[in-house]
From Swiss-Prot:
Residues 302-316 have a biased composition (Low complexity). One of its GO terms (cellular component) is nucleus. It is found in: Nucleus. A zinc finger (GATA-type) spans 184-208, 238-262. Expressed at high levels in heart, small intestine, stomach, ovary, and liver. Found at much lower levels in lung, spleen, pancreas and skin. SMART domains: ZnF_GATA (SM00401). Residues 91-113, 364-380 have a biased composition (Polar residues). Residues 284-293 have a biased composition (Basic residues). One of its GO terms (molecular function) is DNA binding. Pfam families: GATA (PF00320), GATA-N (PF05349). It comes from Xenopus laevis (African clawed frog). This is Transcription factor GATA-4. GO terms for biological process: canonical Wnt signaling pathway; cardiac muscle tissue development; cell fate commitment; negative regulation of transcription by RNA polymerase II; positive regulation of DNA-templated transcription; positive regulation of transcription by RNA polymerase II. Residues 75-113, 279-339, 359-392 are annotated as: Disordered.
């Protein structure tokens, strides 16, 4: 590949090497982009970064050479131990020495301000070097290499903490309700399901806060004593009989407390109750329960209801027990015995219970009665034959 390039360059001089090149030709002089060489040389001398040598280019190996060097020097400098032929004697650049180690290549960072050479060297470093600092190192390089970051040491957690501090809920009281160390200013309670505030901003427990909200006054600290029963009020005695126990305390015309008995007696008779009527115990009525009369009426109704079906059943049975009219010549041989059994069954049914129904309620036709006791001769013959079979 490089041989082909070399062969192509050896065929003849380049277009810009001859006398009729673009920069020295007459057509180039009339071109708008044409720059005379005198102006170029003056511009090159005025530029600080293209000067031959200076205090600012001491650390760079490239700064020791001129940009526009001679052809012979350029050819020897461009090919230090290489087989590449020279390209152009006019526009050639000097090459840097071969890089042997990464530390040999250094890049200097210079400030455009007017700083001395020592100051520039202080703030310049190579690729493998570190900045020089007047302060001591926080930790040694060995410790820094062996240090491993913890799984919780990340910038995300720090951002979350800062965000939590900045984005605090505006209603701070809502979060402060769960804090410890509060005390109710009224009752001194340390714990409550809900902390409240009074009109002045002091903290109240839930009970004191609700009491203050409903009644408008502070909740009393001492619970009121339970009201004693009327029969055992402390310090009360009847002004008439001087008793201390009663079911109901009353007042007389003078406003003095009296027992229930003396008060009723005075109200009914208009005179004070005599002391001879005083009793040790309190007489109470033996009141009957109000549901007792209702239960009795219910039992009476149930008894009457239980009797009515039996009477109706006996009437229906009596109607069913009535004999059926039979023609005189077709009476069965067991008619007489059947009538007796029916009569006995009817007597047992009617005699059930306390009620008794007489036999005349059963009406029999005279024809049937005559037929039962006076059968026809044909029926008698059949009846006799049947009796003979039974007796045999």
């Amino acid at each position: 590949m490089y041989q082909s390039i070399a062969m192509a360059t050896n065929h003849g001089p380049s277009g810009y090497e001859g006398t009729g090149s673009f920069m020295h030709s007459a057509t180039a002089a009339t071109s708008p982009v044409y720059v005379p060489t005198t102006r170029v040389s003056s511009m090159i001398h005025s530029l600080p970064y293209l000067q031959t040598s200076g205090s600012s280019q001491q650390g760079s190996p490239v700064s020791g050479h001129n940009m526009w060097a001679q052809a012979g020097v350029e050819s020897s400098a461009y090919n230090p131990g290489t087989s590449h032929p020279p390209v152009s004697p006019r526009f050639t650049f000097s090459s840097s020495p071969p890089i042997t180690a990464p530390s040999s290549r250094e890049v200097s960072y210079s400030s455009p301000l007017g700083i001395s050479a020592n100051g520039r060297e202080q703030y310049s470093r190579g690729l493998g070097a570190t900045y020089a600092s007047p302060y001591p190192a926080y930790m040694s390089p060995d410790m820094g290499a062996a240090w491993t970051a913890s799984p919780f040491d990340s910038s995300m957690l720090h951002n979350l903490q800062n965000r939590a501090v900045t984005s605090r809920h505006p209603n701070i009281e809502f979060f402060d309700d769960f804090s410890e160390g509060r005390e109710c200013v009224n009752c001194g309670a340390m714990s409550t399901p809900l902390w409240r505030r009074d009109g002045t901003g002091h903290y109240l427990c839930n009970a004191c806060g609700l009491y203050h909200k409903m009644n408008g006054i502070n909740r009393p600290l001492i619970k009121p004593q339970r009201r004693l029963s009327a029969s055992r009020r402390v310090g009360l005695s009847c002004a008439n009989c001087h008793t201390t126990t009663t079911t109901l305390w009353r007042r007389n015309a003078e406003g003095e407390p009296v027992c229930n008995a003396c008060g009723l007696y005075m109200k009914l008779h208009g005179v004070p109750r005599p002391l001879a009527m005083k009793k040790e115990g309190i007489q109470t009525r033996k009141r009957k329960p109000k549901n007792l009369s209702k239960s009795k009426t219910l039992t009476g109704q149930s008894g009457s209801d239980s009797l009515t079906p039996s009477t109706s059943s006996t009437n229906s049975m009596g109607e069913e027990m009535r004999p059926i009219k039979i023609e005189p010549g077709l009476s069965p041989p067991y008619d007489h015995s059947n009538s007796i059994s029916q009569a006995s069954a009817l007597s047992t049914i009617t005699s059930h219970g306390s009620s008794y129904y007489p036999m005349p309620s059963l009406k029999l036709s005279p024809q049937n009665h005559h037929s039962t006791f006076n059968p026809s001769p044909q029926a008698n013959s059949k009846h006799d034959s049947w009796n003979n079979l039974v007796l045999a």
